[in-house]
Regions:
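Alpha-helical transmembrane segments
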Residues: 3-4, 38, 42, 69-76, ...
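Alpha-helical transmembrane segments of multi-pass membrane proteins
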Residues: 11-15, 76-87, 114, 138-149
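Alpha-helical transmembrane segments and their lipid-water interface positions
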Residues: 18-22, 43-50
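C-terminal membrane-associated helical module and adjoining short loops/tails
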Residues: 98-175
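Membrane-embedded alpha-helical segments that form the functional core of polytopic membrane enzymes
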Residues: 1-34, 69-78, 138
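Helix-coil boundary and interhelical linker segments in multi-pass alpha-helical membrane proteins
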Residues: 1-6, 48-72, 113-134
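Interhelical loop and helix-boundary elements at the membrane-water interface
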Residues: 23-41, 85-105, 151-166
C-alpha cells in the first residue's frame, strides 16, 4: 500500500505542476483539460475507491461475508469523483476557487488510512479505521464533500506574486 500512496502522491504532484506549467507557457487546450481530468480520474477517483473497497473488505464482520457486498460501497467514491471532475470541466465558476472538495485532497485523506494502519501501533486507531461504520460514514462524507456547493480555495497560481497569492501561500505554510 505504501507504493500505491507513493505513486498517487507523485501523480498529484505532477497534476499540480502540469497545469501550472501549461498556464505559465499559455498552452492550455480543451484536449489538455480532458486528458488532465482523465489522469485525475485514475489517481484521484479509481485509486481511493479501490482503497476503500480493500479497507471495507478487511472491516467486514464474518457474518457479512456471505453477501460480500459491503466493499463495493467504497466504489461510490469513484462515481462521486467522476461526477465532480465532469462538473469541474463544464463549470465556469471554478477558475479561482473550487466548488466542492478537490479530488486530490479527498484522495490524500483516503490513502492515509492504510498508511496509518501500517505505520502506527495503536489498537484504538486500528479499531476505528477498520470499523465498517466508520468507513461507510467516510465514504458518504467523501461523496458529499466532493460535490458540495461550498467554495474552497484553489492552489492555482497565475503569478508567483505574494500579494495576489497571500492566502494560497498561507495555506501551504500552515499545511
Amino acid at each position: 500500500m505504501k507504493w500505491t500512496a507513493f505513486f498517487v502522491c507523485l501523480g498529484i504532484f505532477f497534476d499540480f505542476f502540469d497545469g501550472l506549467l501549461a498556464r505559465k507557457l499559455n498552452v492550455q487546450t480543451a484536449l489538455g483539460l480532458q486528458l488532465d481530468s482523465l489522469a485525475d480520474m485514475v489517481t484521484s477517483g479509481v485509486v481511493p475507491g479501490l482503497v476503500l473497497f480493500h479497507l471495507l473488505g478487511l472491516a467486514s464482520p464474518p457474518s457479512w461475508e456471505t453477501t460480500g457486498l459491503l466493499p463495493y460501497f467504497g466504489l461510490l467514491v469513484t462515481l462521486a469523483s467522476a461526477y465532480r471532475l465532469a462538473n469541474f470541466n463544464v463549470s465556469t465558476e471554478q477558475s479561482d476557487a473550487f466548488i466542492g472538495l478537490p479530488t486530490p485532497a479527498n484522495t490524500l485523506l483516503i490513502i492515509s488510512l492504510p498508511l496509518l494502519l501500517e505505520y502506527q501501533n495503536s489498537a484504538a486507531v486500528t479499531t476505528i479505521i477498520l470499523n465498517p461504520w466508520f468507513l461507510v460514514g467516510l465514504t458518504v462524507l467523501s461523496c458529499y464533500l466532493l460535490n458540495a456547493p461550498v467554495k474552497l480555495i484553489a492552489l492555482k497560481f497565475k503569478t508567483w506574486d505574494f500579494k495576489t497569492n497571500a492566502n494560497r501561500y498561507l495555506l501551504i505554510i500552515l499545511s
